[in-house]
Regions:
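Membrane-embedded alpha-helical segments in integral membrane proteins
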Residues: 1-12, 32-36, 117, 148, ...
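Periplasmic/extracellular loop-to-transmembrane helix junction in inner-membrane transport proteins
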Residues: 1-20, 40-45, 73-128, 339-359
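Alpha-helical transmembrane segments of integral membrane proteins
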Residues: 107-383
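Residue-level preference for alpha-helix termini and adjacent loops
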Residues: 68-72, 83, 98-99, 324-329, ...
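Hydrophobic cores of alpha-helical transmembrane segments in multi-pass inner/ER membrane proteins
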Residues: 23-30, 93, 193-197
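Short helix-capping and inter-helix turn/linker motifs at the boundaries of alpha-helical repeat units
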Residues: 31-32, 88-90, 269
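N-terminal signal-anchor/first transmembrane alpha helix
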Residues: 7-76, 153-156, 218-226
Length: 383
């Protein structure tokens, strides 16, 4: 079968990623132009490590956004004639090259790698955001008030953290568990926290202005109930909000495993920051505890939380890859990176490059997050 040269392979690779390169140029131009107004993110301009990490992360973000433009084939498109072909093999019928070759079912590895980034970037950051909302909602009052509730919550957090994470994930996403109501129950509990946190933020700001507080509460409850019904019960009357049951199962498992760590971090930061002079000044002004937690303590804890969020998304990405490698969670034909590695690892001796696309994608994304976290840590330490 006809193949293109190595130079043509890389030329096609970079050409197909044109929307990504253009988006990266615009993003970094905006970063350098408005760096003085972007806070800690703008400070990354003076951190080469942080810029490299941000470049890698944004590469995959834009790759996921423009996957339909970048990919040459559909992620599930098969061709029995082109199974396990090396990089650069040309599809004679279409005249289109398989940039990184094909897998055992004749699916384009480059296209599946690009579409796989959508799955990772859909689940990992979103689950970490919910985990942070859960950890912040419980960690702020626990660290601020202390008492028996703090003791109970700390014990439960330590209990969850004592489990090996891989074993915990296996127990939560096993096929038998997916068929029960446990994922929906867990998701139902976790998705209550964003609503509770939004209510807490509004109350802390407008507790003495009922003309603003009550309408704001009503809006939050209405929008929250709509999103809640779609995400947890797949019962959105408008049909706009829904999530695949397999993804919901993984989502709930990620939040369950990540929330205790966030809780402990927020609790520790709260116990430290509440002793600062500006918190005492807020108490002297007569500010309530919820105002102090939301508007005095939380903003001053943002540095460690931002750094930890980058590391946590990378950690969750590795866990998702591990689950996919063991065939857990996602559908067997899913183009997520872990499943791709699992599906191609048996043919390394026949086609040594067959596992490289998914492996390098997973490794580079996690590396980018770690470098970005290092850069943010350096800049937050300077502040």
């Amino acid at each position: 079968m006809e193949q293109i040269s190595s130079f043509e392979i890389w030329y096609t690779f970079f050409y197909q990623l044109s929307p990504v390169w253009i988006s990266l140029f615009i993003a970094f131009s905006a970063l350098f132009i408005w760096r003085k107004n972007l806070g800690i993110l703008g400070h990354l301009c003076s951190s080469p490590i942080g810029l490299v990490g941000l470049f890698i992360v944004l590469f995959w973000v834009f790759g996921a956004i423009f996957a339909d433009l970048v990919a040459l084939f559909e992620p599930f498109e098969q061709s029995g004639r082109y199974r396990r072909k090396p990089p650069g093999t040309i599809n004679a019928e279409l005249g289109i090259p398989y940039i990184f070759g094909t897998d055992t079912l004749g699916r384009d590895l480059f296209s599946r790698m690009i579409y796989g980034s959508q799955i990772v970037l859909l689940i990992a950051p979103a689950a970490c955001v919910v985990a942070y909302v859960v950890g912040i909602t419980l960690g702020l009052p626990s660290g601020y008030f202390g008492g028996r509730s703090d003791t109970v919550l700390s014990f439960l957090a330590n209990l969850v953290l004592a489990f090996p994470v891989i074993l915990l994930f296996y127990l939560l996403v096993a096929p038998g568990v997916r068929e029960t109501m446990l994922p929906n129950i867990m998701a139902g509990v976790f998705f209550l926290f964003p609503i509770a946190f939004a209510l807490m933020v509004v109350y802390s700001r407008f507790s003495e202005r009922l003309n603003v507080l009550i309408p704001s509460f009503n809006i939050i409850i209405i929008i929250g109930s709509w999103l809640y019904s779609g995400l947890v019960f797949n019962a959105d009357p408008l049909g706009l909000v829904q999530i695949d049951p397999n993804e919901l199962n993984i989502f709930a498992a990620v939040v369950f495993a990540s929330s205790p760590g966030v809780f402990r971090l927020v609790r520790g930061l709260t116990m430290d920051i509440k002793t600062r002079d500006y918190v005492a000044a807020a108490m002297t002004r007569g500010e309530g505890p919820f105002f102090i937690m939301i508007w005095e303590i939380l903003p001053n804890a943002r540095g460690p939380l931002i750094v930890d969020s980058c590391l946590r998304v990378g950690y969750v990405t590795i866990l998702l890859g591990t689950l996919g490698f063991f065939g857990l969670g996602m559908e067997p034909e899913s183009p997520d990176w872990g499943s791709m590695i699992n599906q191609t690892r048996s043919y390394i001796r026949l086609v040594p490059t067959i596992v490289l696309p998914a492996t390098l994608a997973l490794a580079s994304f996690v590396l980018g997050l770690n470098l970005l976290a290092d850069g943010l840590r350096e800049e937050s330490a300077k502040d």
